[in-house]
Amino acid sequence: MKVVKVGFVKVGNIGSAPLLEFLLDERAERQDIDVRVVSSGAKMTPEVAVEVAQKMLEFKPDFAVVSSPNASLPGPTKARETLKNAGVPTVVVSDSPAKKAVKQMEEAGFGYIIVE
């Protein structure tokens, strides 16, 4: 059985962020996935966002989820671009202000969930 590596990169904090990684394996019983979380805490600068995305790349995820408030800001943008440039399929989870970046995310091939 192939174990799928799932990475969660948290840049800043949105209300649903503490629950995201548990949606896939709440009881830690699944043997077909391996989950890692890397967070910047409250910081959302481009430099910190790139740092946490690069830390996630050390895990070599099969795909990643980047959560942040306002995904249109430079920090969250840099995090997802870092993962994309490394060839990691990425889904963005963000809040309403991220709607400003929907077209950009679609054109770049990112999946996204906007929590209102």
Q: Model-found features: residue ranges?
A:
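Metallocofactor- and cofactor-centric catalytic cores in central/energy metabolism, strongly enriched
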Residues: 1-90
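Generic beta-sheet signal
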Residues: 93, 115-116
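Glycine-rich, charge-decorated loop segments at or immediately adjacent to ligand/cofactor-binding or catalytic sites
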Residues: 95-112
